[in-house]
Amino acid sequence: MGALTFRDVAIEFSLEEWQCLDTEQQNLYRNVMLDNYRNLVFLGIAVSKPDLITCLEQEKEPWNLKTHDMVAKPPVICSHIAQDLWPEQGIKDYFQEVILRQYKKCRHENLLLRKGCKNVDEFKMHKKGYNRHNQCLTTSHSKIFQCDKYVKVFHKFSNSNRHKIRHTSKKPFKCKECGKLFCILSHLAQHKKIHTGEKSYKCEEYGKAFNESSNCTTHKRITEKKPYKCKECGKAFNWFSHFTTHKRIHTGEKPYQCEKCGKFFNQSTNLTTHKRIHTGEKPYKCEECGKAFNQSSNLTEHKKIHTKEQPYKCEKCGKAFKWSSTLTKHKRIHNGEKPYKCEECGKAFNRSSTLNRHKITHTGGKPYKYKECGKAFNQSSTLTIHKIIHTVEKFYKCEECGKAFSRISHLTTHKRIHTGEKPYKCEECGRAFNQSSTLTTHKRIHTGEKPYECEECGKAFNRSSTLTTHKIIHSGEKIYKCKECGKAFRRFSHLTRHKTIHT
């Protein structure tokens, strides 16, 4: 048996195969490949670093490597069988990857290396090996159905058609239980396990079962011993890549720089997310309402608005909540805990938001002041947004009025003020809007949807701003004060109405 090499333990993906994996599965693949290579290095087996490892370490997509690595190095074919193998020179380029795979599968590596035969006997032996191998090549020659989008060939025309469905919006396979559609039958089969409860992948150590092999592999990694330990703080990791990233906390190293604003990051994923601030890209879209987000975690949190599920229940009164953090805040009503104290007057509150609203009474309405320009705001979130004006360079300038923006999406939206364009139209009443978010909010008038619920009384609203105003009723605070007579009001509209007395 020959010596073990990295290629023996490596797994390769084409572009379409790689795109079928979710983010968790892609990360799992990276970590497993990197760990396999490091184990070979530790055992003294791996001498040179494969291109695949370099690619994974730089967190690039590995499918690119496979195409170049395979196609750029054609097999050295025996001169006696070259004509049989390549009947048409024009087809050669399409089959190089296929032939390489078939040779590897049939274990006839000698056919790839030998260019000539010394005598007739040797040729007969060589030809015998070729005849056995030719059975595999027969199927390879039939792979003439090519995908137009990516250079991939297939045994049968039916396989080619099935593959091409991936590049179209067609999803012919439907789940009878929930109606969800899939472009590949195997994906439907995997999905059905959710309804049947089938969990065919079992952890032998703990007995826990999973419906996907990737979930089982991840579970095993979590439960097994963590071999990579940090000397600084003692924290251990089961992935070497996680360990490497963690060390940057202690060293302060931030190797990933944004080309737009110059900001540095210790993880490439953080840089990728940050770049969306400049491009305005929001790849994570809610299927229910169409709202888009630049982070998957934000979409996950948002989805809870649409589901009526309230898994977090109070043991005292039985009230249920969507988020565990909301339950934690609610419990303070029962135990009387008030952890948020006002430094001015000593008054305590059970919510930080209530304390912030209370502070306005001491500061005259705008407690959040920016030292750079002296401008003050009545909400911390508004101050945070304002800071961007000073910290982020505005690359995108309006040619009409000269106003500049830090995001191209903001400039695009702004331009509609000048053009009067309103591309987002309501199908119910025909009313048009210049922003998709405004249309989304408007649609709730027709659907009756009220996703913003008050944690105190359960009353729901179709706008977050209306909920914010409503919350003041529960706090009892009167944050809007008349400068003329000193009278205070809970709502800004009440103050505005009151001011007419003085004028």
Curated annotation (Swiss-Prot):
- Which residues are in the KRAB domain? 4-75
* Any one of the GO CC terms: nucleus
Localization per Swiss-Prot or TrEMBL:
Nucleus
Q: Where are the zinc fingers (C2H2-type)?
A: 145-167, 173-195, 228-250, 256-278, 284-306, 312-334, 340-362, 368-390, 396-418, 424-446, 452-474, 480-502
The answer to keyword Transcription regulation applying to this record is yes
Major subcellular location class: nucleus
Which keywords accompany this UniProt record?
Answer: DNA-binding, Metal-binding, Nucleus, Repeat, Transcription, Transcription regulation, Zinc, Zinc-finger
Q: Which residues form a coiled coil?
A: none
Any one biological process term the GO annotation gives = regulation of DNA-templated transcription
According to the lineage, what is the superkingdom? Eukaryota
In its UniProt record, a GO molecular function of this protein is: zinc ion binding
Q: What does this protein do?
A: May be involved in transcriptional regulation.
PANTHER family assigned:
C2H2-TYPE DOMAIN-CONTAINING PROTEIN, ZNF44 PROTEIN
Family classification: Belongs to the krueppel C2H2-type zinc-finger protein family.
What's this protein's name? Answer: Putative zinc finger protein 730
Organism whose genome encodes this protein: Homo sapiens (Human)
Starting at the broadest rank, the lineage of the source organism is: Eukaryota, Metazoa, Chordata, Craniata, Vertebrata
Q: Which gene encodes it?
A: ZNF730
